[in-house]
Amino acid sequence: MDDTGSNPPIAGPFQPAHPPTLDNPITEAPAPHTTPVAGKTGPDAAAQGMGGGARGSISSESSKLIDESTKLFPNVAGAASEAFRSERSASTSSTTSETGSDRPMGSASTVTEVPYGRRPSHGHGGHHGLFEGLMDQKRRNDPASVARRQSLNEQRPVPQGFIAKMWDNWVRGTTP
């Protein structure tokens, strides 16, 4: 083909031919899912073009939320969000190919794996002081503590209700 500029670039189903120039990209950016498809208008037109139904509208809503969150919080965009975006684009391209859309499919090689470093194990070592205070909370078996507990139990009023009696029997270990 001839790239002399005589022919305008061909736009995809969700991309305008010439993107608008925006002064403030946060407040003036058009939503990517509102592009009309085949003469239909409304916010679900793009979802209907992807195959319609609840699945299309859910994916368009989630893409809207993800796109708006990256505009509002640009510092959050990092390696994890890029990996999520590439996984999301790969999953949406596979669903569009099932519905017969003319949108090009992405290959599986476009999904990049982000290597995570060795994570510290949560079950072994490193938490030496985590359970140290439990030994201090243990019931003491010295005679003074046992006598004090016994006198406090005797001074308590007799339980009135069925559940209170059942609880006391359970705690004491006696059968009803």
Curated annotation (Swiss-Prot):
Region Disordered, residue ranges: 1-66, 79-162
**Composition-biased stretches (Low complexity):** 79-99
Q: Which GO terms describe its biological process?
A: conidium formation; sporulation resulting in formation of a cellular spore
Provide the alphabetized UniProt keywords.
Conidiation, Differentiation, Sporulation
Instruction: Please identify the protein, giving its name as recorded.
Output: Conidiation-specific protein 8
- Identify the species of origin: Neurospora crassa (strain ATCC 24698 / 74-OR23-1A / CBS 708.71 / DSM 1257 / FGSC 987)
